[in-house]
Amino acid sequence: MTKHVLIIGFVWPEPKSSAAGSRMMQLIEAFQSFNYKITFASACAKQDHAFDLNLLDIQQVFIQLNSASFDEFLKELNPDIVVFDRFMVEEQFGWRVSEHCPEALKVLDTEDLHCLRKGRELALKDKALFDKSYLFNEVSKREIASIYRCDLSLIISEEEIEILKNQFKVSEHLLYYLPFLTDSISADIKKKLPKIKEREHFISVGNFIHAPNYDALLFLKYEIWPLIRKKLPQAEMHVYGAYASEKVNQLNNKKEGFLIKGYVDDVNQVMKYAKVCLAPLRFGAGLKGKLIDAMLNGTPCVMTTIAAEGMFGGFEANGFIVDDPQKFADKAIELYTDKIFWNGKQKNGFVVMNARFDKRLFISDFMYKMNAIHTNINAHRLDNFTGQMLQQQTLQSTKYMSKWIELKNSIKT
């Protein structure tokens, strides 16, 4: 019998705008490759760049927050698996799933650890060393509680698995490592990519409403790019990303060669003709979609430690990893001007992609894991007493707050 997956999205997937959107489409592809029927629901309004899920024959449902209409929808759909797109969605809808579809497997797709990103942001603002006092923040309490309430959480980075196990003491049986899932890079694809002599300029990519990307943009503009431009006056910095605001567009300066290009429909078409990708992230979490795009297109990178986290495992990076602005600029210049270095780093990227992110390495095992837990879901939950406790206590407050808002809204209308 065909199994039914309900994905509740924080937003409608935008694979051309963000790594989160690409990740969601990869999950959808994984489920469909094993013949799961998919319903995608979201309380968010669709944006212009949202992917047309009709093309994949996916049922789409607009849902309301704090509304009993979701309960009726859930009971009628009766899904086998419910995937929550980030912990905020689980907070809103998780208790309703537990109440009306208690046998459904609850899966949290963390995207990245929001609490880790927030802690690093706070430490950066304080100009302090990141430690437990920053990691154990208000977001942590919410996100870790959400992980416990779910049967399985998908973690995109091995580094984050270790943080959850060692810092938060989350049991490993609640966590599943599932990185970006990409096609392999064949010899034919490598051969067709533009060579170094056919490429020019530097590139940076990132959704501008994502706080780490905006901070990286300012760091690049004011502390790194002037050092590069001084040595390479003919080179330009091309910055691409969705949702460029006025404050972003004001950073455009043709005289300095710093160009805000904005949204691009196909990042591959600009990435493969760029010579070097720069990723000067100072805080953040998860895996960086911009580095995946760069490696897929054979574009070497200069990146910070934060950007490189979880990307390379035991393999050589597709570029240089440096945090100091002057050293970052020096390595960018070196990579831009040295063909031997450039070719070597490009090859590293191909090796990393095929060894660490080829979807064929992960999808079958992931589906087996889901099926195994779902088949023995009661036994699995008995090993998660903390989750049962949070389900009983924390969710009661969430549930009754939601019902109070629901009642309040009904009185208004």
Question: Which sequence ranges carry the predicted segments?
Answer:
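Conserved catalytic-core segment of nucleotide-activated headgroup transferases in glycan assembly
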Residues: 40, 166-170, 175-268, 272
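A short, active-site helix/loop in glycosyltransferases that binds the activated sugar's phosphate group
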Residues: 92-93, 140-172, 248
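Acceptor-binding helix/loop patch of EC 2.4 sugar-transfer enzymes
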Residues: 14, 103-104, 108-137, 197, ...
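Conserved acidic donor-binding segment of nucleotide-sugar-dependent glycosyltransferases
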Residues: 318-326, 334-339
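N-terminal subdomain of nucleotide-sugar transferases
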Residues: 1-50
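C-terminal amphipathic helix plus adjacent low-complexity
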Residues: 348-413
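Acidic donor-binding loop of glycosyltransferase active sites
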Residues: 79, 272-286, 299
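Short hydrophobic beta-strand element within catalytic cores of glycosyltransferases
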Residues: 290-293, 300-304
